[in-house]
Amino acid sequence: METIQLQPVRFDEIYPSRKNETLRMSRQDIVDVEPILSRREVKRLPFIEANTQEVTIEHLKEDCIVPVFSKDNEITISHPHFIESVWEAANRVFPSEQVETPEIRVSHIIKGRTPEAIHKPVRDLLEEDKTIYYERMMFCFEIPTIYEDIMGNRLNLTIGGVRAYNHENLYSKKGAEKFKIFIGFKNMVCCNMCVSTDGFKSELKVMDVHGLFNAAMQLFQEYNAAKHLYYMGAFKDSYMTEHQFAQFLGKCRLYQYLPVEQKKKLPQMLMTDTQIGIVAKSFYNDENFSTIENGNEISMWNVYNLLTGANKSSYIDNFLDRAYNATQLADGLNKALYGDSEYAWFIQ
C-alpha cells in the first residue's frame, strides 16, 4: 500500500455573502461549487440515524433562513456555506479524484414566522408566513477513487462535518463560530464512519468561511490515510473471546457509575447504556459482524464495527466525538489483548 502524499496548495480568497447563496472563488480555474451534482445512483444506508432526516443543499439554500447573533444582527455562517467550503477544499486537495455530492442530514427544526404573520392564528398561517432552520446539521461525501479493502469490506475515503447551533451563543455578539470537520473512511458494507486522531477537528473555531476553508485544507493535507488504514487493518488479526467481550460490556456499564476520582484514572468511554445494549445485541445478531461463524471469538475488526454501528444512534452534535472514541476504544482494547495496561481494566 502506498502512502498518499498530499501537496500544499495555494488559497486565494473566499468571499462570503450575507445571503444564503453559493460561495464563489476568485480564481476562474477553481471548480465551480454552484452545481454540486450527485453521482450517487444507489440508495445507501444513512451514516447517522437518530432523530435525523435527509435534505438537499437546495432545500437549505431556498427554504431555510440563516440565524443571526441577536446583539449585533451579524449573520452566522450558514449550513450551505459550511458544506461548500469543505467540499471545495476537498476538490483542491484531491484535484484528480472523484469527489461525490454531499449527503446531508439535519435535526431539531426551529420554526418561526415572518413579521407580517406575527398575529395570525396557527390555523391561518400560509407557507410563505413560516420560517425554518435546522439547529443541527451533518454532512459527508465520499472520494470513492481512494479506497481500501479490509476483510472483504470496502472502505471509501470520506470527508464531512457537523454544525450545531446549540453550541453557539446566538444571544450575544458575533464571535468565533464552532464547527467539527473530519476526514476518514466509510465502511460501505454498513456505512459506519471510521475517524482517526489526525483526521478530526472536534472544535474548530473560525470567524468566516475563509477560516473554514483554510482549516479544512490543513486537516486534509496533514491526514495520513495509509497510517489510519494500517491501524484498522491490524484489527483483523486480533480476537476477543466471548468472556472478554462480556467483560468489556459489563465494565462499560459500570464505567457510567464509577466514582469521579476512579473514572479520571481510566480512558474516556462515551457510549451510552442504550448503545452498549445495541453492541451486545449485535454481537449475536449483526448480519455482517456477529460471531456466529467463529464460535466464541470475535475479531477486533468486528468489535470496532459493532462500536461504530451503535454510534449511528447518536444525535448529530455527539456523533463525531463518539465515532472517534470508538476508534480509541478499539485500538486500546486491541493493545490490552497483548498486555498493554491502559485499557486493561475494560477486559479484566
Where do the model's predicted regions map?
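Intrinsically disordered, low-complexity regions enriched in serine/threonine
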Residues: M1-V42, H119-Q348
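A short acidic/basic microdomain associated with nuclease active sites
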Residues: R92-T131, E135-M138
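Feature for intrinsically disordered/low-complexity regulatory segments and propeptides
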Residues: M1-W87, P95-E97, R105
